Every structure is written in structure tokens, then in C-alpha cells.
């Protein structure tokens, strides 16, 4: 498969066919790419062709790989509206591959200079600092995620859960204590012998069991009077006793 020269270092989109299949490639270059770095352009073309062949040979398991001068990051995405396209090579109808391959290319020296943090002439200082800050942020995030798992330093989420559980258990214990206290006071104080007095606590807003007042000693009650006769007979009996009428009749 012979390829036309690439537009390095400018991005481009190429349609390549192998057999009866058509493949769409997007080639994108990173900020570390400079056109004047490599004088022999034939070397660049050969490395790009080898990169495309490597991608076609490993379409189902794409992984980053390294050439003599570049680091290639291959990606695969869906080819939109590919069913509406038709390709022919002479009289042969070609079948388009339903995915698009995108190659992100960086200079090999770019990755080698990142661990030391020292920028080279090919890499701007701002780019190196940005990469180092991203790495430090990742390390801090990983450290924060690992800290809650240690028993000595529980994370904020775990501490919040423990505080809520302790508060709920304390509230439940207070309710049980109040219930048992009320039952004991009811058992110790019969309703027929004494009277229970409850006071209202203005701060807590609930009734508290009060003091128990001993029963009062009552003297013997006076005998009940017979109900007086009512009506006209009662009025007559009040004026003239009955024995007066019986005495008159006997005479």
C-alpha cells in the first residue's frame, strides 16, 4: 500500500483502502510537534505509514505505541452517516469500515522530559507546568480517596455517618429511659391511694413525672339524712306531724 505524502505537521484526514475496504484516518499533532525538528521528511512519512499499518493490524485492541521519533495514541469512534456513502476503486465497489481512526501524535522527547520537570527547547515551560500540576492533582485525589479506608483517620463521609448514628442511638435511648421511668412510677403509685402530679418543663416541652402526694386522712363522715318527703304531703307533715292525725282519729 503506497501512500501519498503527508501534510506534516498540519492535521489531515485520509481515506485509505486495503483490499475491498475503505478506512478513514484522522491525523492530529500535539503541541510538541515542530516542523523544523526533523530535516529528513522521508523518515516522517515512513513512520506515519508504519503507524497506520500497526493500527490496521490491531483494530480490535488499540494501544499507544512508540516509533523512533513519535508517540502515537490511536482511538476509534463511530463513523456517522457512513451508510449514505459509496466508494469505488475502478469498477470495484468498496465497503467502508464503520469506525473512524484518530491518531494523536506527540514527540518522543515530550514524554521523556515530563518526569524530571525540566523543559527542553522543543517544549514550552507552560506545557510542562500544566502536566506537572495535573499529575500532582491526581496524586492528591488518590490520597484523599485512600485516607477514609484507614481506621485511624476516618473520612468526612464516614464521620458524618457515625455522628448521625450516635445521635439517633442517643435519642432512642432517651425515649426508652422515659418510657421505663413512666411505667415504674405508674406501678409504684396506685390510682386509688394517691394522686400523681405532673409538671410542664418550659425548656424541654414535655411532661415530667412529679411528686406523689400521700392520701389525706378523712374523719368519719356524718350519717346521711333521709330525703324529705316532697309535694303536698311533705308540706303537711312539716306543719302537723302524722301522730297528731292518728291521735285525733282514736279519740
From Swiss-Prot:
It is found in: Nucleus inner membrane; Chromosome, Telomere. Residues 183-198 have a biased composition (Polar residues). One of its GO terms (cellular component) is nuclear inner membrane. Residues 1-227 are nuclear. GO terms for molecular function: DNA binding. GO terms for biological process: double-strand break repair involved in meiotic recombination; homologous chromosome pairing at meiosis; meiotic attachment of telomere to nuclear envelope; meiotic telomere clustering; oogenesis; spermatogenesis. It is a single-pass membrane protein. Its main location: nucleus. Residues 247-251 are perinuclear space. The chain crosses the membrane at residues 228-246. Meiosis-specific telomere-associated protein involved in meiotic telomere attachment to the nucleus inner membrane, a crucial step for homologous pairing and synapsis. Component of the MAJIN-TERB1-TERB2 complex, which promotes telomere cap exchange by mediating attachment of telomeric DNA to the inner nuclear membrane and replacement of the protective cap of telomeric chromosomes: in early meiosis, the MAJIN-TERB1-TERB2 complex associates with telomeric DNA and the shelterin/telosome complex. Component of the MAJIN-TERB1-TERB2 complex, composed of MAJIN, TERB1 and TERB2. Belongs to the MAJIN family. This is Membrane-anchored junction protein.
Amino acid at each position: 500500500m503506497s501512500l501519498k505524502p503527508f501534510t506534516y505537521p498540519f492535521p489531515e484526514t485520509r481515506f485509505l483502502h486495503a483490499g475491498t475496504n475503505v478506512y478513514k484516518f484522522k491525523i492530529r499533532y500535539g503541541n510538541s510537534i515542530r516542523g523544523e525538528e526533523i530535516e529528513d521528511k522521508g523518515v516522517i512519512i515512513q513512520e506515519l505509514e508504519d503507524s497506520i499499518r500497526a493500527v490496521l493490524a490491531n483494530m480490535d485492541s488499540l494501544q499507544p505505541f512508540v516509533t523512533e521519533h513519535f508517540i502515537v495514541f490511536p482511538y476509534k469512534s463511530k463513523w456517522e452517516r457512513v451508510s449514505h456513502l459509496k466508494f469505488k476503486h475502478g469498477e470495484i465497489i468498496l465497503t467502508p469500515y464503520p469506525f473512524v481512526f484518530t491518531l494523536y501524535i506527540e514527540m518522543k522527547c515530550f514524554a521523556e522530559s515530563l518526569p524530571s520537570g525540566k523543559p527542553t527547547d522543543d517544549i514550552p515551560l507552560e506545557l510542562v507546568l500544566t502536566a506537572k500540576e495535573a499529575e500532582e492533582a491526581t496524586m492528591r485525589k488518590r490520597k484523599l480517596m485512600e485516607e477514609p479506608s484507614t481506621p485511624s483517620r476516618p473520612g468526612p463521609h464516614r464521620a458524618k455517618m457515625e455522628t448521625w448514628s450516635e445521635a439517633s442511638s442517643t435519642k432512642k435511648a432517651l425515649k426508652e429511659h422515659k418510657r421505663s421511668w413512666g411505667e415504674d412510677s405508674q406501678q409504684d403509685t396506685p390510682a386509688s391511694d394517691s394522686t400523681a402530679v405532673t409538671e410542664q418543663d418550659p425548656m424541654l416541652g414535655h411532661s415530667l413525672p412529679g411528686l406523689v402526694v400521700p392520701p389525706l386522712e378523712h374523719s368519719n363522715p356524718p350519717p346521711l339524712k333521709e330525703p324529705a318527703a316532697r309535694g303536698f304531703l311533705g308540706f303537711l307533715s312539716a306543719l302537723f306531724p302524722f301522730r297528731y292525725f292518728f291521735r285525733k282519729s282514736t279519740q
